[in-house]
Amino acid sequence: MDFALLLAKLPEAYQIFDPLVDVLPLIPLFFLLLAFVWQAAVGFK
């Protein structure tokens, strides 16, 4: 039962990380964009 109580309190504990969680899914898109820009810079060899 203590574990369930701990699990219930987690969202409050991680409230400060909400902006970070919003940004995390975008990171792979930034890598894709970076790869495209890099290939454009080297001339798509």
Curated annotation (Swiss-Prot):
Keywords, ordered alphabetically: Membrane, Photosynthesis, Photosystem II, Reaction center, Thylakoid, Transmembrane, Transmembrane helix
InterPro entries: PSII_PsbK, PSII_PsbK_sf
Lipid bilayer topology: Single-pass membrane protein
Prosegment residue ranges: 1-8
Superkingdom to which the source organism belongs: Bacteria
Membrane-spanning residues: 24-44
GO biological process terms on file: photosynthesis
Subunit relationships: PSII is composed of 1 copy each of membrane proteins PsbA, PsbB, PsbC, PsbD, PsbE, PsbF, PsbH, PsbI, PsbJ, PsbK, PsbL, PsbM, PsbT, PsbX, PsbY, PsbZ, Psb30/Ycf12, peripheral proteins PsbO, CyanoQ (PsbQ), PsbU, PsbV and a large number of cofactors. It forms dimeric complexes.
UniProt family annotation: Belongs to the PsbK family.
Function: One of the components of the core complex of photosystem II (PSII). PSII is a light-driven water:plastoquinone oxidoreductase that uses light energy to abstract electrons from H(2)O, generating O(2) and a proton gradient subsequently used for ATP formation. It consists of a core antenna complex that captures photons, and an electron transfer chain that converts photonic excitation into a charge separation.
Name used for this protein in its record: Photosystem II reaction center protein K
Organism: Gloeothece citriformis (strain PCC 7424)
